[in-house]
Amino acid sequence: GRERMKDFIDYAHSKNVDVFLWYSSSGYWNDIVQGPTNYMDNPIIRKKEMKWLHNIGVKGIKVDFFGGDKQETMRLYEAILSDADDNGLMVIFHGCTLPRGWERMYPNYVGSEAVLASENLIFQQHFCDEEAFNACLHPFIRNTIGCMEFGGTFLNKRLNRNNDGGNIRKTTDVFQLATAVLFQNPIQNFALAPNNLTDAPQVCLDFMKQVPTTWDETRFIE
């Protein structure tokens, strides 16, 4: 819980791990129940929360569930980025609009989902069946616009945390590892499950530890 978050962050740092925390964008337009809610839409509460996050050593935030592209929401994106920058926090947007040059305006902007991302593989088998086909399109369509926070690289064949049920992955481990290079985003959030740390081939884990997330240039190969 919130009262133990500082202990959690300290433990992560002892393992040389930095932490991003998830938030809902909230607001009167947003009726989701997943919390924490009502922290990001109110300027006073948001600034106080971000100061607290900085003080306990959080590296960044992932803000989710934005309500369309109306002017008020577009202003909210930039307000979150600006306040986060003031507090040394990086920002990932999820459930959001396409990025619009924010990487040139805010040095703490990491990336945006704005794509039918990896979570859909868990929702429906259809997305697993089409994963390889869609992966051939993303670099030439969505990812040309800006950083794409796909959150992929599944190593379980069955897409639940215990690898014993749910949808069936149709792609190989090598394919999954390749998406860490194919899909450009300054931070790659791998879809690891706890059992992967003991069950996955060590070569896969070593690759995920070492693969770069930023590149000097990107070239399309015909």
What positions do the PLM features span?
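Aromatic- and carboxylate-enriched substrate-binding clefts and catalytic-loop regions
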Residues: 1-172
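Generic hydrophobic/packing signal
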Residues: 1, 20, 186-192
